[in-house]
């Protein structure tokens, strides 16, 4: 029986392989920890980060103990969409990073879809 960590790593590598085949677009990558959620727009051909947003940003950060919830994921999604729009990015590939498309990940993606197409 596979452990949860091994399943996660296998899922992440499978997603990254599929994304690497569509290399003509930049990718919106997310990472979530127990306390925070991070989003980055990365250009893999140049190996640079174009824009980033997280719950550590001053506009999003509050006095709550946990910032990795749906309410803050929506704020991070809107922030990354605004930064991408100002950088002139209209289309991205969504890299959920091995996380299941549910809850916080879905909320961030739906909020980012307001200004970015993926």
Swiss-Prot record:
GO terms for molecular function: 5S rRNA binding; structural constituent of ribosome. Keywords: Ribonucleoprotein, Ribosomal protein, RNA-binding, rRNA-binding. It comes from the Bacteria. It comes from Rickettsia canadensis (strain McKiel). This is one of the proteins that bind and probably mediate the attachment of the 5S RNA into the large ribosomal subunit, where it forms part of the central protuberance. Part of the 50S ribosomal subunit; part of the 5S rRNA/L5/L18/L25 subcomplex. Contacts the 5S and 23S rRNAs. This is Large ribosomal subunit protein uL18. The lineage of its organism: Bacteria, Pseudomonadati, Pseudomonadota, Alphaproteobacteria, Rickettsiales. Belongs to the universal ribosomal protein uL18 family. One of its GO terms (cellular component) is cytosolic large ribosomal subunit. Coiled coil: none annotated. InterPro entries: Ribosomal_uL18_bac-type (IPR004389), Ribosomal_uL18_bac/euk (IPR005484). The keyword Protein transport does not apply. One of its GO terms (biological process) is translation. The gene is rplR.
